[in-house]
Curated annotation (Swiss-Prot):
The modification Phosphoserine is found at S129. The keyword Disulfide bond applies. The precursor molecule is proteolytically cleaved by CORIN at Arg-123 to produce the atrial natriuretic peptide. Undergoes further proteolytic cleavage by unknown proteases to give rise to long-acting natriuretic peptide, vessel dilator and kaliuretic peptide. Additional processing gives rise to the auriculin and atriopeptin peptides. In the kidneys, alternative processing by an unknown protease results in the peptide urodilatin. The lineage of its organism: Eukaryota, Metazoa, Chordata, Craniata, Vertebrata. GO terms for cellular component: cell projection; cytoplasm; extracellular space; perikaryon. GO terms for molecular function: hormone activity; hormone receptor binding. Residues 147-151 are annotated as: Important for degradation of atrial natriuretic peptide by IDE. This is Natriuretic peptides A. SMART domains: NAT_PEP (SM00183). The record marks R123, S124, C130, F131 as: Cleavage. Residues 26-123, 93-103 form a propeptide. Belongs to the natriuretic peptide family.
């Protein structure tokens, strides 16, 4: 390092300590005032009052009327017939014919089995979406890697 670069580094180092407010990190919670937080809370309460609860059954006609009103300002899209709740025979996979909707327990069981199959698939166990292969092995030995459970000894 030459004398000019040493002086420059020293000057920048001193400048960093001279103005800590402009260079240092500021916490996020100071950026919003209590009045702003109260406004957000009131807005959230207002939206919760306007939204129907999940337990209440909303008729499909009311939903289609709401979507028609909301979509009036958008560009015209081709009309899609509303879903009637019926499942095609190809989707039933051997279920009894004549049933128009799936029961909640059947849907949850189907979703659980698909999720379990996805999580236990060998391909998903080999992949790491966090690091490259070499960095993943280094991180696993230090206990900081994404798949550190696979490489423990």
């Amino acid at each position: 390092m030459g004398p000019f670069s040493t002086i420059t580094v020293s000057f920048l180092f001193c400048l960093a300590f001279w103005h800590p407010d402009q260079i240092g990190a500021n916490p996020v919670y100071n950026a919003m005032s209590n009045a702003d937080l109260m406004d957000f809370k009131n807005l959230l309460d207002h939206l919760e009052d306007r939204m129907p609860f999940e337990d209440e059954a909303v008729p499909p006609q009311a939903l289609s009327e709401q979507s028609d009103e909301a979509g009036a300002a958008l560009s015209p899209l081709p009309e899609v017939p509303p879903w009637t709740g019926e499942v095609s025979p190809a989707q039933r996979d051997g279920e009894a014919l004549g049933r128009s909707t799936w029961e909640a327990s059947e849907r949850s069981a189907l979703l659980k089995s698909k999720l379990r199959a996805l999580l236990t698939a060998p391909r998903s166990l080999r992949r790491s979406s966090c690091f490259g292969g070499r960095i993943d092995r280094i991180g696993a030995q230090s206990g900081l890697g994404c798949n550190s459970f696979r490489y423990r000894r």
